[in-house]
Amino acid sequence: MQSDRANHLFQPDSKLEDVITRYYFDKELRLILFDAIETIEITLRTKMIYHLSQSYGGLWYRDPRLFADVAFHTQHLKELIEEFLRSNEIFVKDYRSKHLVTDASGEKTLDEHPDAWIIFEVATFGTLSKIYKNLNHQLPEKSAIANDMGLNLHNELSGWLEAISYMRNIIAHHSRIWSRNMVKRPCEIHNPRMTWLSRPLTEVQQKKPFYVITAMLYLCNAIDEGHTFKEKLLALFEEYADVPIYKIGFFNRWKEEPIWK
């Protein structure tokens, strides 16, 4: 609605009511997206814990042999432990009371590391997605997790998780989705297992929130048949019918796309 962003000048026909309406639209959109991301996050966490713990034991996340890049593994492990030490969950506090010690450098650490099903409960979506991406590509469990989430290839899931993690960070910082170009976007997928888009999107379309939102819808369809993500979005668009959703990438005839029917 601005004609000059640098000088904060608005177009002549701009109305305060429209600004307020779009603000509330964006706020409600973020809540719906956050709820869907939580579903994806819980599934990713559960699948990682199950598949990898079954094969390699509860402390698999500490084994550098399971990861493609040892330096990244060291960094991600540090982040994982830091998140665990910061958590205020009761079960974490109980674990810390028994195992928290001070190392030779004076830093707090654990004398006994928790199994994956404990420490991963408080891991952030970003940390989970980075740990998954860095798993050795040859591990059958990496592919199994991708398959469980509806995708054929683990690199497709890694790319999607990275884009969704970026979306989550935008929402967590209360930043707008409206009229935004996404720095991270989902990679293209081949031979989708479920209903998807009928054609590849243009370069411009791929930068819009629509592409990430559609990837999220695909994952929700794969992991939870009873989800209401699409219904909530459609209801929001109907409630705010005067808000032009092309600004978030919903192009003409988007409802005719197989996944959105």
Predicted regions: what they are:
Residues 1-261:
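Long, contiguous internal "core" modules enriched in hydrophobic/ aromatic residues
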